[in-house]
Structures are given as structure tokens and as C-alpha cells.
UniProtKB/Swiss-Prot annotation:
4'-phosphopantetheine is transferred from CoA to a specific serine of apo-ACP by AcpS. This modification is essential for activity because fatty acids are bound in thioester linkage to the sulfhydryl of the prosthetic group. Disulfide bonds: none annotated. It comes from Desulfatibacillum aliphaticivorans. The gene is acpP. GO terms for cellular component: cytosol; membrane. Its main location: cytoplasm. GO terms for molecular function: acyl binding; acyl carrier activity. Residues 1-76 form the Carrier domain. This is Acyl carrier protein. Carrier of the growing fatty acid chain in fatty acid biosynthesis. The modification O-(pantetheine 4'-phosphoryl)serine is found at residue 36.
Length: 76
């Protein structure tokens, strides 16, 4: 399973959205309906799955699906 597929599966699981809604340009808040608690849980899941730590400052910059994919690629 590719990194993108793993990220997509986590987003589908945590936000309860359809897989076809999770495209790279999708905004977590505007397109996928996430609230601040959802975003915290999403970041925690990414940290656990990919064994990395995302600072609060960095997490605030992760607004779209592509942002989290690019962050993980750069830090793993």
C-alpha cells in the first residue's frame, strides 16, 4: 500500500467521508467537514502510523490532503 493510500484510508476512517472525496486538493475543513478536534485526531493518527512527530506549528499549516502527504514524505 502506498503512502497516499495509507493517508487516504486514515482520513476516510477518522472523518467518515467517502474515499472518492479524499483528493489531494481537498481541504479538511471546507471540503471534508473536519472540525478542530477532527484535525487533532487526524494528526495524531498520522504521527502514530508513520512514526513521526508533527509540531502544533506545523500542524496548523496542514490544511489539505496534499499538505499531509508532502509533510510525511519530507519527514520519513
Amino acid at each position: 500500500m502506498s503512502l497516499e493510500e495509507k493517508v487516504k484510508n486514515i482520513i476516510v476512517d477518522k472523518l467518515g467521508v467517502e474515499p472518492d472525496e479524499v483528493v489531494e486538493e481537498a481541504s479538511f475543513v471546507d471540503d471534508l467537514g473536519a472540525d478542530s478536534l477532527d484535525l487533532v485526531e487526524l494528526i495524531m493518527s498520522m504521527e502514530e502510523t508513520f512514526d513521526l512527530e508533527i509540531s502544533d506549528e506545523e500542524a496548523e499549516k496542514i490544511l489539505k490532503v496534499k499538505d499531509v502527504i508532502e509533510y510525511i514524505k519530507a519527514h520519513t
